Amino acid sequence: MLIFLLLGWTFCGLALCGTAYALLAARFAGRFVKKPLPDNASRAAVSLLKPLHGGAPGLAEDLESFCRQDYAGPVQIVFGVQDAADPSIPIVEALKARFPALEIALVLDDKSHGPNAKVSNLANIMAAARHDLLILSDDDIAVPPDWLAVCAE
């Protein structure tokens, strides 16, 4: 009979521990929920630096995704190439024509700052960046419309 009493109290204790764990988990679960983005009016000015090289498949669509950002703060997109014959130049010019309200700059500078071409390209386009908040991105990715807001948060 004593064994049944001990088993009963053991299972009650385990049930209480499980209940306490569930209550604590419910209490602190809010810490892991995505926080809302700040109001658009308080967004920081951003310079987005995009070093380009060549005309990879889908480049126009990838670059266009950066032009379609849902971000109310000032945005400057600075594209950079090191070769005047780079096939990405006409794509950038088409974006400038398609999105005239955006501040889009194209920097052509073949100056080398070391053995890494991408780093040299970034160093060349840094001078054209007007804002303190800099976001760097490769040319071969597409992003969702809230990408810039999440990055600038």
Short names for language-model regions:
Residues G55-G58, A84, P144:
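Donor nucleotide-sugar binding loop of glycosyltransferases
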Residues P87, D132, D138-E153:
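Acidic donor-binding/catalytic loop of UDP-sugar-dependent glycosyltransferases
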